[in-house]
Structure formats: C-alpha cells, structure tokens
Amino acid sequence: GYERGYRRGTENLPGALGMAAALEAGGEPYMHNGAWKLMAEFAAEVRAVGGTWHSDRFDRPTCYINAIAMPGLSAKAQVMRFDMAGISVSQGSACSSGTMKPSRVLEAMGVERDVAERTIRVSLGWNTTREEVQRFCEVWLDMAKRA
C-alpha cells in the first residue's frame, strides 16, 4: 500500500499538508488586497451599462473569478479586443481554454444562450492592482458603449 500502508492510491498526503500550510501562510494578501472592493466597484459599472454580472446569482460569490456579459458584443469579439488592448480574458472556463463555445456551466445555471455567447471570464490574482482593474473597467466600458 501507499503512505506506509495506511491508504490505497497515489495521494500525496505530505504534499497536501504542505500545500495547506503554504496557503495558510501566504493567503493573507488575498484577504486584504482590496479585491472584494475592486470587484464590487466593477460590478456596479457593469450593471450601469446593462451588462450581466453572473455572480449576482450566488449567495457567496468569489471576487477572484467572475463571468460577465456585455450587451451587444460576442465573447469572441471581446476576447480579441481585450487582447489588442493588452488585457487577458477568456471565454469559458480555464479547463476549456481554446474553446469558442458558450460555457456548459452557464447553460447549467440557466443562463440564456445569447447571454452565454456574450459572456467572458475575468480573473484577479493576488497581485492585481487597483490600476489594472480600473484599466480593465475603462476598456470594458468603452467597448460596451460602442457595441
């Protein structure tokens, strides 16, 4: 057996415990980097121009990964325009990167197909700055006004 005969399989228990300790020690910046405030501000901007903030469907959403839909512009077009502006976003989940189809997760959530086709995924990291979020907001809002 594995893990000195205590369990079957290939789980790396020492590795998992080490990762848990590292996350506890290093997770503090995530809690205090202002990401919640940044995303709340951006969500208000998205709603103000008629966009859809999919996290509104949840009681306890995350501030680090969000799906937003822009009125009048496909996700594919948004991804290309953000890329030209030097900003990385995606259409769909990380595990389906490269796919240009609406997310099955959004479909399962009951999101209408036309809204899903206009939805992009936006992620914040532990080191995302207020300036980067503001730049993203400016580009997104400019796109929404032109759509």
Task: Walk through the language-model features, giving the residues of each.
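Glycine- and other small-residue-rich loops at beta-strand/loop junctions that grip anionic moieties
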Residues: 8, 31, 67-68, 94, ...
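Conserved PLP-dependent catalytic core of the aminotransferase class-I/II
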Residues: 27-81
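Glycine-rich beta-alpha junction loops
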Residues: 1-2, 12, 23, 42, ...
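PLP-dependent enzyme catalytic core of the Aspartate aminotransferase-like
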Residues: 101-147
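Conserved core segment of the aminotransferase class I/II
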Residues: 1-32
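Conserved C-terminal alpha-helix-loop-beta "cap" of PLP-dependent enzymes
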Residues: 66-121
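Predominant activation on well-ordered alpha-helical scaffold segments within soluble catalytic domains
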Residues: 14-24, 43, 79, 83, ...
